[in-house]
């Protein structure tokens, strides 16, 4: 590689992107510096702005520039349904189907004991409190008094996603919540953001 600490630093930074190895990162770095310096500066400014301005929605945990995201703030959404997904990308995939008009809760991950990711790391207690709020005495509200009437589990059909869905389902069912899971039309081992929209729409419609 060229003798440049700055170039090495850029290459190492690009390697932090998912699926980008050393060779791909080097190609990107050389391309930007050789052929598109204005584009490189645009990327740098956009990235800095996004990091500084984007936060987690106070209600659903997705990424937003506001305290409450556009979806949660929309009075036209069906507030009786809460769809649980792993990532904002999964949420976006479901939105593109136009088959779901409820609200979301974004875990920002999945349970993975081998990687040290437990319930607290993906905000399960926040999810439980959102789905089944407590009264002034600390007791769960009766089902008829809750805003959320159904929790739809749309975690990915991977081993970790299935385990996460199982833990959530057990906890919420014990609190008297109706819990459904996307139908098995979504291939085992797949991630929602890579599944075609028709398949996702059918999985939503046929959930059980």
UniProtKB/Swiss-Prot annotation:
Pfam families: RecR_C, RecR_HhH, RecR_ZnF, Toprim_4
Gene Ontology molecular function: any one: DNA binding
Toprim domain residues: 80-187
Keywords, in A-Z order: DNA damage, DNA recombination, DNA repair, Metal-binding, Zinc, Zinc-finger
Gene Ontology terms: biological process: DNA recombination; DNA repair
Zinc finger (C4-type): 57-72
Protein role: May play a role in DNA repair. It seems to be involved in an RecBC-independent recombinational process of DNA repair. It may act with RecF and RecO.
UniProt-listed HAMAP family: RecR (MF_00017)
Family: Belongs to the RecR family.
Protein name per UniProt: Recombination protein RecR
Protein's organism: Polaromonas naphthalenivorans (strain CJ2)
Gene name linked to the record: recR
């Amino acid at each position: 590689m060229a003798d440049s600490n700055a170039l090495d630093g850029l290459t190492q930074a690009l390697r932090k992107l998912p699926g980008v190895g050393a060779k791909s990162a080097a190609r990107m770095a050389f391309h930007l510096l050789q052929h598109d310096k204005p584009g490189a500066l645009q990327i740098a400014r956009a990235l800095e702005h996004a990091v500084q301005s984007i936060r987690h929605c106070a209600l659903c945990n997705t990424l937003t520039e506001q305290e409450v995201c556009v979806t949660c703030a929309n009075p036209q959404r069906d507030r009786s349904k809460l769809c649980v997904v792993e990532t904002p990308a999964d949420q976006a995939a479901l939105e593109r189907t136009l088959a779901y008009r409820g609200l979301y809760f974004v875990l920002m991950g999945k349970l993975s004991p081998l990687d040290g990711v437990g319930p607290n790391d993906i905000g399960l207690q926040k999810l439980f409190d959102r789905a089944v709020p407590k009264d002034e005495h600390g007791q769960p509200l009766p089902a008829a008094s809750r805003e959320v009437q159904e929790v739809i589990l749309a975690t990915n059909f991977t081993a970790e996603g299935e385990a996460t869905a199982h833990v959530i389902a057990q906890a919420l069912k014990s609190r008297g919540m109706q819990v459904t899971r996307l139908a098995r039309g979504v291939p085992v081992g797949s991630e929602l953001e890579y599944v075609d929209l028709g398949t996702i729409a059918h999985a939503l419609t046929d959930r059980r």
